[in-house]
């Protein structure tokens, strides 16, 4: 009987540690973290920016797009589809910033009810910050984000 108690005593903490590790590794949906509405129809606009450093002049080049349902419904739907499909992995506490001299993407989706929505900052290597917590984006989500940016560039340039 004593061995059974000892076994149960050590089984409980081991199960809790395993559960914590699985929760840590479980990917989180971007739309849930950003507190977005249930459907893309409830989004008023999406602000999409790409900030790229110019290493020769030490300045930053910012390209910004504001997509609305009235002007660009297809593009807005494409960005919203990405926001609803993308997954963030491995949350890590951080100081809320990304310190890297590389390319950064900034996405902000504004709901139709004008409620406050967080912004997601994404570096080219897949690191992201939402509400001061660092995450990693999957490679296929980063590839889709690059494709959306290229699509926006071909339309507006």
Where are these regions (language model features)?
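Function-determining sites in protein domains
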Residues: 2-157
């Amino acid at each position: 009987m004593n061995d059974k108690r000892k076994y149960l005593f050590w089984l409980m903490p081991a199960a809790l540690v395993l559960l914590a590790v699985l929760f840590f590794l479980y990917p989180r949906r971007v739309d849930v973290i950003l507190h977005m509405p249930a459907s893309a129809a409830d989004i008023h606009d999406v602000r999409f920016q790409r900030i790229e450093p110019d290493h020769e002049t030490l300045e930053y080049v910012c390209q910004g797009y504001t997509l609305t349902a009235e002007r660009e419904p297809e593009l807005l739907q494409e960005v919203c589809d990405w926001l609803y499909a993308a997954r963030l992995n491995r949350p890590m506490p951080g100081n809320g910033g990304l310190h890297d001299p590389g390319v950064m993407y900034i996405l902000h989706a504004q709901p139709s009810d004008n409620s406050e929505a967080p912004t997601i900052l994404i570096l080219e290597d897949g690191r992201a910050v939402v509400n001061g917590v660092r995450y990693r984006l999957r490679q296929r989500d980063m590839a889709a984000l690059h494709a959306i940016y290229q699509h926006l560039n071909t339309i507006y340039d």
